[in-house]
């Protein structure tokens, strides 16, 4: 059996919506320029400058880990291009964000930054950023999240067999691994010359790390083509089921602090660092919950039955049961819940909150065999009979859910990165970092002037 994998993304991309700490205010407001043309959209120089300042603010006190300004600008611009492409694709797929949803998101951002929406406006003004621009940025990032969610729901699935295999593997190793990586990207269908250039660059990066001239995190920020380069290439904690099979065996044999590679993967050359490891089973105590077995009878309220009529009907049904009528037989005859009526109102075993707080409170308050007084929920009027209760260990169930989630996340990361490469390859992108918005000339993005840098990766094609 294959189940769809769904993912909820909880944070906005820092590249465009980070508010705290706020970067220093602009000293002047020059005529805006076009940094890049992206199909029928553009990235303005003001957007690029603001995004670069946001990245620098996140590295306050660690500026030496950032690449030269021209390299950083190119990395950030490429991210903004990808945001524009995703927003455009989402719009074509009918993904929208209402003003009400946007207002709630901004209120949440303000709260996370310890201020109000008005206070947020003031901070943005001090940063030289208009509130309308900020709203547009947040809207774009929510849209990108929803595009990822839609992608996950339509293309990512995890089978029970995959979960079983991962659980067996996890039981055999019992370890989780904190990883970081550096990706030297190669275009799809790379030529021999491009592969050789990529190999030369990754060898150069590895040499810098081995000599101690750069630590791994700084090298990732400076040279990696991965979307998480500006986070030092940090991949977080992974179990073996989240790691591509080609790398899993290698990681098993590594010690914390070791760097492996270069390794050739589908996206290019990789360097992989094992930051630390831990026992995945530590703290894995049982989690016990109370489950209840119950039956119910529902009388709905609608066009053909008023509130008063429904209440009178449920009162009559309860009186019959209290008078000796069998609950199951009465449910088959009178319940308006089509899902459970055929089973005599039987709901099986469930935790108290499975059918909402009102229903749960009624079940919890009963003794086994007792029948509740009529009570109202959004569905209508109910009576419920508690059949039994038990303590259940749900740790195994939770573990399966967690493993399914981690496998799904790994698949989503791999597939969505390929999807982004496809979007980027199909798009018309022209870099115009030196031109005013009303000029027609174009200019390629600046290359690194760092004399110690290995050769840059092959340029991504533009049309």
Swiss-Prot record:
Compositionally biased residues, Low complexity: 440-452
Record Pfam families: Rotamase (PF00639), Rotamase_3 (PF13616), SurA_N (PF09312)
Subcellular location: Periplasm
Cellular component terms (Gene Ontology): outer membrane-bounded periplasmic space
Signal peptide: 1-25
Sequence ranges assigned to domain PpiC in this UniProt record: 174-276, 289-388
InterPro entries linked to this entry: OMP_Chaperone_SurA, PPIase_dom_sf, PPIase_PpiC, PPIase_SurA, SurA_N, Trigger_fact/SurA_dom_sf
Major enzyme class: isomerase
A GO term for molecular function: unfolded protein binding
Keywords tagged on the record: Chaperone, Isomerase, Periplasm, Repeat, Rotamase, Signal
Reaction equation(s) it catalyzes: [protein]-peptidylproline (omega=180) = [protein]-peptidylproline (omega=0)
Biological role: Chaperone involved in the correct folding and assembly of outer membrane proteins. Recognizes specific patterns of aromatic residues and the orientation of their side chains, which are found more frequently in integral outer membrane proteins. May act in both early periplasmic and late outer membrane-associated steps of protein maturation.
Record-given protein name: Chaperone SurA
């Amino acid at each position: 059996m294959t189940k769809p994998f769904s993912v909820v993304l909880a944070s906005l991309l820092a590249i465009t919506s980070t508010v705290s700490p706020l970067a220093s205010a602009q000293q002047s407001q020059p005529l805006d320029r076009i940094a890049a043309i992206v199909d029928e959209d553009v990235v303005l120089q003001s957007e690029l400058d603001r995004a670069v300042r946001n990245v620098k603010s996140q590295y306050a006190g660690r500026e030496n880990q950032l690449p030269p300004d021209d390299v950083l600008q190119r990395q950030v611009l490429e991210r903004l291009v990808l945001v524009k492409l995703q927003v455009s694709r989402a719009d074509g797929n009918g993904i929208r964000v209402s003003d009400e949803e946007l207002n709630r998101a901004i209120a949440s951002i303000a709260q996370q930054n310890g201020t109000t929406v008005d206070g947020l406006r003031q901070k943005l003004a001090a940063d030289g950023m208009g509130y309308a621009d900020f709203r547009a940025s947040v809207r774009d990032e929510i849209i990108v999240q929803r595009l990822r969610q839609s992608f996950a729901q339509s293309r990512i699935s995890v089978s029970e067999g995959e979960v079983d295999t991962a659980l067996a593997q996890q039981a055999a190793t019992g370890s989780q691994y904190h990883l970081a990586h550096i990706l030297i990207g190669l275009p799809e269908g790379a030529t021999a010359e491009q592969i050789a250039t990529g190999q030369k660059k990754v060898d150069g990066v590895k040499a810098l790390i081995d000599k101690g001239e750069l630590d791994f995190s700084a090298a990732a920020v400076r040279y990696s083509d991965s979307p998480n380069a500006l986070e030092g290439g940090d991949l977080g904690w992974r179990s073996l089921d989240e790691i591509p099979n080609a790398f899993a065996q290698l990681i098993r044999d590594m010690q914390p602090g070791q760097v492996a590679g270069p390794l050739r993967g589908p996206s290019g050359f990789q360097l992989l660092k094992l930051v630390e490891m831990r026992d995945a089973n530590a703290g894995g105590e049982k989690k016990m919950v109370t489950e209840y077995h119950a039956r119910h009878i529902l009388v709905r309220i609608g066009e053909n039955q008023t509130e008063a009529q429904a209440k009178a009907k449920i009162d009559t049904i309860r009186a019959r049961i209290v008078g000796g009528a069998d609950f199951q037989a009465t449910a088959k005859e009178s319940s308006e819940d089509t899902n459970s009526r055929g089973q005599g109102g039987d709901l099986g075993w469930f935790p108290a909150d499975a059918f909402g707080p009102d229903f749960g409170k009624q079940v919890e308050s009963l003794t086994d065999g007792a029948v509740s007084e009529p009570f109202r929920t959004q569905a209508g009027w109910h009576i419920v009979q508690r059949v039994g209760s038990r303590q259940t260990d749900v740790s195994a169930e939770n573990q399966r859910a967690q493993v399914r989630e981690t496998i799904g996340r790994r698949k989503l990361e791999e597939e969505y990165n390929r999807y982004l490469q496809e979007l980027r390859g199909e798009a018309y992108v022209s870099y115009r970092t030196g031109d005013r918005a009303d000029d027609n000339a174009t200019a390629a993005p600046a290359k690194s002037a760092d004399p110690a840098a290995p050769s840059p990766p092959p340029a991504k094609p533009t049309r």
